[in-house]
Curated annotation (Swiss-Prot):
It catalyses: a 1,2-diacyl-sn-glycero-3-phosphocholine + H2O = a 1-acyl-sn-glycero-3-phosphocholine + a fatty acid + H(+). It comes from the Eukaryota. The lineage of its organism: Eukaryota, Metazoa, Chordata, Craniata, Vertebrata. Keywords: Calcium, Disulfide bond, Hydrolase, Lipid degradation, Lipid metabolism, Neurotoxin, Presynaptic neurotoxin, Secreted, Toxin. It comes from Bungarus candidus (Malayan krait). This is Basic phospholipase A2 T1-2 A chain.
């Protein structure tokens, strides 16, 4: 899921 991946990145780099 691309959504899950993007959510992980948004928490890594605000």
């Amino acid at each position: 899921n691309l959504y899950q991946f993007k959510e992980m990145i948004r928490y890594t780099i605000p």
